[in-house]
Amino acid sequence: PSPCANPEEIAGAFDELRRRGLVRRFGVSNFPVPKFRMLQSYLAEPLLTNQVEASPLHLNAFDDGTIDLALRMRIRPMVWSPLAGGRLFDTQDARSVRVAEALRAVGAPQGEERLDVLALAWLMAHPASIMPVVGSGNPARLRAAAEAVRVKFSEADWISVYAASQGHEVP
């Protein structure tokens, strides 16, 4: 969001679009927690979502309060770049390799080895009910992404991937 964004103007535009029946609900993208709260304070209706970057290699939203705020407000965050822009598949990067091994350790007993499916399943297993945004229009990739719903992560499984990404155990 622009540092000069006027929340009254944004709220007015949202209200007008809703009044005219052009939209039912609104969400925002890449709003840090303070800006999200500030905009929400001007709106008559609650925001539906905040679309943010997150993946097993990009944990900021889990650590900066973004996902915590979504849980508190009972909204489902959307996540862009759920495969870290392809970095998840980098076999030369130590962090990517650790994360891939942790994901496959969870997926193997369930018959799943594909990193894209496992990364999406990991995101969706979070208590915030994260909705990954899959940037592909390729039908085969979309079918694979849909298969992520069948892969289950326990809390311990989820934390094992998070810890692999951080490079140390989670206290």
Residue ranges: model-predicted function:
Residues 1-171:
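Beta/alpha (TIM)-barrel catalytic core signal, keyed to glycine-rich beta->alpha loops juxtaposed to Asp/Glu
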